UniProtKB/Swiss-Prot annotation:
Protein name in UniProt: Lysis protein for colicins E2 and E3
Signal peptide interval: 1-19
Disulphide bonds in the chain: none
Lipid sites, type S-diacylglycerol cysteine: C20
Chain's role: Lysis proteins are required for both colicin release and partial cell lysis.
Species for this entry: Escherichia coli
Superkingdom per UniProt: Bacteria
Gene Ontology biological process terms from the UniProt entry: cytolysis
Lipid attachment site numbers (N-palmitoyl cysteine): C20
Gene Ontology cellular-component terms listed: cell outer membrane
First-listed, main subcellular location of the protein, grouped into a coarse class: membrane
Membrane-topology descriptor: Lipid-anchor
Amino acid sequence: MKKITGIILLLLAVIILSACQANYIRDVQGGTVSPSSTAEVTGLATQ
């Protein structure tokens, strides 16, 4: 039972991380109209 919980937590972490990375990449490419929280945290200048 403990192993299943660990696998589920790992999957959730991967999904969350990949979602954050997708937002970060979109910010770098200037895909957003307004700077998102990730751009503000990393200090990226949005055009």
